[in-house]
A protein has these predicted regions:
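Small-residue hinge/turn detector
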Residues: 149-161
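Glycosyltransferase-associated regions of secretory-pathway enzymes
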Residues: 2-148, 164-443
Length: 443
């Protein structure tokens, strides 16, 4: 009997319609297709569950071939300097070598004044992020420190990894930057506190610098929103400065505090707090969260280490010293000569308040001296400055005389052995034989 005959046993009408519309071969393979789909969905669900944030008490840092390590931060160390590593001077060689010695499994690259523009064009040009505004802005900036700050943010956004200034020494392997209680897969930025002095937040000069994260060394994943926010904030800020000064970006003049707040630690800190707050479900994140922290903490997927980690030995902010177990790097500051081109406020008599190094008594005394000076008439101020300059000249002359007298004394001391030979030592005879001594006694 034909299966199409009206007299054949048919079952339900829907089943007949399904058999008529679906080929027999496909019906036979259908269970296999369904099984494959189930397996694919199961695999996808396992991957999804594995990527979900884990409670801290269950989190473990995986081994070399674990899933956490393969999804970790790029194993790349970046630095920038005037010249390539083969042309480094001794002090740059010594600090740079610590990064490769302590981290043999990491790649290492230095961008220089000769290849930085090519890097920016490659990654932010038409074949990269296609941001001609960023490329043009970087091309027009002439201030070395501004370009150095911009470049580190652009590198980290494009490729991620570890960035360190050329005068930073690595004390511990990068693998120790993330404590074991955290899962590396849950983090996308590792930073440290640099200055933790909120008591000075209202000071007219120190206020903007009193609470900041360190940006001479940090670790980031590529595409981090903090890095792009920094680049775009700097672009807008430079445009405003150029407009206010009525000059092109290439000709802007910046003082020390403008650099700090525009591209340096203050700008870095603001961008970090903004991103933390945007990610937070409990309201804005302020510096109170990081004031006086003894250990590291994670906020909005950003690991913040205490001041001792990246900024030990500063003499303030409870920064400890470089011999402690918690100190990860050491900043030598030998490449930090940019303030000479971007001077900070220096009073003609009382100097810079930064020389107080955040000592509260010193800062109060400096403020009082400045207030007393400002209360004088212009003629009195001029006389005070002249008296101070004359006193400095007198002290310089006295110091020079002391130095010359010291040289004469050292020269005479060096020539004295030639003029007065040392006295001859008395001749010492070897001890006599005991038997001979007895004979002499008998005589």
């Amino acid at each position: 009997m034909s299966p199409l005959s009206p007299l054949s046993p048919t079952g339900s009408t829907k089943a007949n319609l399904f058999r008529n519309r679906v080929p027999t071969q496909l019906r036979r393979c259908l269970p296999l297709y369904i099984a494959c789909v189930c397996i694919i969905l199961l695999v996808l669900n396992i991957d999804l569950f594995g990527s979900m944030p884990k409670p801290i008490h269950l989190s473990k840092r995986g081994g070399r071939h674990s899933k956490a390590s393969t999804r970790g931060f790029p194993k790349k160390i970046w630095q920038s300097w005037k010249v390539a590593p083969f042309s480094f001077e001794a002090e740059q060689i010594l600090t740079a070598r610590t990064w490769t010695d302590k981290n043999p499994g990491y790649r290492y690259e230095v961008l220089t004044d000769n290849n930085d523009m090519e890097y920016v064009e490659e990654h932010y040009g038409p074949d990269g992020f296609d941001r001609p505004d960023i490329v043009e802005m970087y091309r027009n900036v002439n201030a070395t420190i501004i370009k150095a700050d911009l470049l580190r943010y652009m590198i980290m956004y494009a490729e991620g990894g570890v960035y360190a200034d050329i005068d930073v020494e690595d004390l511990r392997p990068v693998s120790r930057w993330i404590p074991e209680r955290y899962n590396e897969a849950d983090l996308d930025l590792v930073i440290g506190v640099e200055i933790d002095q909120p008591n000075f937040k209202d000071h007219p000069i120190l206020g903007k610098k009193s609470m900041s994260f360190c940006q001479w060394t940090f670790m980031s994943r590529s595409g981090h929103p903090v890095m792009l926010k920094l680049v775009e904030n700097i672009m807008a800020w430079l445009s405003d400065v150029a407009k206010n000064q009525r000059v092109p970006i290439s000709a802007v003049k910046l003082d020390f505090d403008e650099v700090i707040s525009g591209t340096g630690p203050s700008a870095f800190t603001k961008a970090v707090l903004d991103v933390m707050s945007a990610r937070s479900r409990s309201g804005p994140i302020t510096w109170d969260t990081f004031h006086d922290i003894d250990e590291s903490k994670v906020v909005s997927n950003i690991l913040v280490r205490n001041v001792e980690s990246f900024a030990a030995g500063q003499g303030h902010s409870d920064s400890g010293n470089h011999n402690s177990r918690g100190a990860l790097i050491k900043h030598h500051y030998h490449a930090s000569n940019w303030p000479s081109r971007h001077p900070r406020f220096r009073h003609p008599i009382f100097g810079e308040v930064e020389r107080c190094n955040w000592n509260i008594e010193c800062v109060i005394k400096w403020d009082q001296d400045i207030a007393a000076f400002n209360s004088l008439s212009p003629e009195e101020q001029k006389q005070k400055v002249e008296d101070h300059e004359n006193l400095q000249k007198l002290q310089a002359q006295q110091n020079q005389q002391k130095a010359e007298q010291q040289k004469v004394a050292e020269k005479m001391a060096a020539e004295q052995p030639l003029m007065f030979p040392p006295p001859q030592q008395p001749l010492q005879l070897p001890p006599a034989d005991p038997a001979t001594q007895e004979e002499l006694k008998m005589v």
